Amino acid sequence: TYGTDGLAHADNGKAVFVQGAVAGDTVEAEVVQDGKSFMRARTTEILEPSPDRIQPPCPFVGICGGCSWGNLSRTAQLAAKEQNLRSTLERIGKFSPDQVDELVQPIRHTKDDWGYRNKIELEPTVVNGRVRLGMHGVDPRKIVTVDSCPLFDKRFPKALKSVVGALNYLSGSHDLGLERVGIRASRRTKALEVALWTPTGSFPRSQVSRVLADAAHPTSVVRVMSKGEKKARRVSKVEMLAGEGSWTENIAEGQMRLSAPSFFQVNTKGAEILIELVMEALDPQEDELAVDLYCGAGTFTLPLARRCDFV
């Protein structure tokens, strides 16, 4: 399916979304919701695993919401994504199968199954009266506490554990007011930034920067202050606590310097494939003017600027 569940059908033809199952599995499942047009079930036992099921390198697959397809082979993941796109074009776009065949090209992907993410975000939760950091679970009401993530850049294997340990230690004696924590890492520039998202107000700046520096050796530590209701917060200020105050990444023959709130693709190699595809399609010339109507941090703007007269 488009989400995290496997899809089955009951004897009456009703669709059943099965949590914890992948396509090709034979499972025993418990029905947890019986709606008018569909049902939801939870896997209780895998009777016969799918040929596409793998043993993931992360023990939290199926619990943590960060890698819901982590127990599915890479080949099967790519095939499922292509099929989802084709299905969407036919069902919603009303394209014919022949038109879809013409539109959809083979997926171009990186070679990395794991260890490719340049960013990870953590949410705070309270465990036994103390603040703990973790990731959103498959159940969005729960936070899964972890000290490593195989999806995160493998050149920084201790970064997550070091940052989590430092902030857990600090929370024992300081009210940090953490709303979330972002960690960005680049294997190309060796940059490592820790961004602490908090409300405005007092904050133990020197203690936080010192403890994080000793634990994780980041190149940048910043505090991102936000205002407003939780669901509609806006950034009011980014405060540099230590280091460079920004994160750098080499991409597509250039270097980008990004502030913590700025959006950037979490897969640098994947972003380079996107840039390459856009440049191939546009074929920009030296005397042409390009307009980037939704430029963001400049992922496409900067490569265009190296090829066009003006952007």
Over which residues does each language-model region extend?
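Accessory RNA-recognition modules of RNA-modification enzymes
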Residues: 1-311
